[in-house]
Amino acid sequence: MARSGRYKVPFRRRREGLTNYRKRRKLLLSKKPRLVVRKTNKHIIAQIVVAKPQGDVTIVGADTRILAKFGWRGDENNVAAAYLLGLVVGYKARARRVEEAILDIGLHRPAPGARVFAVLKGALDAGLKIPHGEEVLPDEDRIKGKHVAEYAEKLKEENPEAYKARFSRYLQRGLEPEKLPEHFEEVKKKIVEYYEKKLAKVAAQ
């Protein structure tokens, strides 16, 4: 309950933990498209959004379910999937002639190496120009899922039943988690080849 005349009731979306208006204002003042990254319990979502007088307009967007199109059989909410999603959305943005953006992670805590920054790394590798500090990006081994592969290999040796339970989704999809880095590279190659062809067609128009 307010006890002071200076007390201000926060905006509803701020109260509900949905919007940081101070951060949003800074993003809008940049006048650049925003790479908006959000997470759910199962998936990661990335969009290129521009602010218009009537409200935000999404130019391109996707979530990690799109990775199945390129044969992805890993989880849809890990660092590797986040990177591949950023790669896809970065290429999709460039196909729409968007060449630069600014990262918008909403209320996510900006922990170095986090999934939101894996999306950023993917978009950068697709050719988007986005201001960032190198220290926030996950390293190459983590992006490829090497830590997952090493943990899976160790667990398989020490506790096969726990291994089957922990990685049941991978195994149901026909992927041995120890081979995640190799699988990652295969899917990344498919994404790059697919969208480079699209960009070549756009450039020829």
Curated annotation (Swiss-Prot):
GO molecular-function terms, A-Z = 5S rRNA binding; structural constituent of ribosome
Q: Which GO terms describe its biological process?
A: ribosomal large subunit assembly; translation
InterPro entries attached to this UniProt entry: Rbsml_uL18_euk (IPR005485)
A Gene Ontology cellular component where this protein is annotated is:
cytosolic large ribosomal subunit
Keyword field contains Ribosomal protein? yes
Entry keyword annotation includes tRNA-binding? no
Keyword annotations of the record = Ribonucleoprotein, Ribosomal protein, RNA-binding, rRNA-binding
Question: What's the subunit arrangement here?
Answer: Part of the 50S ribosomal subunit. Contacts the 5S and 23S rRNAs.
What does the similarity note say? Belongs to the universal ribosomal protein uL18 family.
Q: What does this protein do?
A: This is one of the proteins that bind and probably mediate the attachment of the 5S RNA into the large ribosomal subunit, where it forms part of the central protuberance.
Its protein name is Large ribosomal subunit protein uL18
